[in-house]
Amino acid sequence: MGVPQGDVEKGKKIFVQRCAQCHTVEAGGKHKTGPNLHGLFGRKTGQAPGFSYTDANKSKGITWDENTLFIYLENPKKYIPGTKMVFAGLKKPEERADLIAYLKESTK
């Protein structure tokens, strides 16, 4: 199917409103309730150094990319049962695409 083209600025607003309470994106950023997301693309689930993940996250074994994030962000607990991420998800495809566009820019 492919991920729709997202808007980085809209994605940044979504991140600030819905994600920044638990996640940071900058290199060397601290882990909060959730892991720092720097270097997310191309990394396997449950692999951010120094963050305590659930076994479910560590054993999922997928690599984060646009497609896996697009599915995950719709309903995290359905995609990784047992994750400690409490976020219910983004149901609108365009919001997920915007957030992914922002994450691609901000986590490199």
From Swiss-Prot:
Residues that, per the record, bind heme c: 19, 22-23, 85
SUPFAM superfamilies named in the record: Cytochrome c
Gene Ontology CC terms: mitochondrial intermembrane space
GO molecular function: electron transfer activity; heme binding; metal ion binding
Cellular location(s): Mitochondrion intermembrane space
Gene3D superfamilies reported for this sequence: Cytochrome c-like domain
Keywords: Electron transport, Heme, Iron, Metal-binding, Mitochondrion, Respiratory chain, Transport
Pfam family name, one: Cytochrom_C
PTM characteristics: Binds 1 heme c group covalently per subunit.
Entry's family note: Belongs to the cytochrome c family.
Function: Electron carrier protein. The oxidized form of the cytochrome c heme group can accept an electron from the heme group of the cytochrome c1 subunit of cytochrome reductase. Cytochrome c then transfers this electron to the cytochrome oxidase complex, the final protein carrier in the mitochondrial electron-transport chain.
Protein name: Cytochrome c
Organism: Schistocerca gregaria (Desert locust)
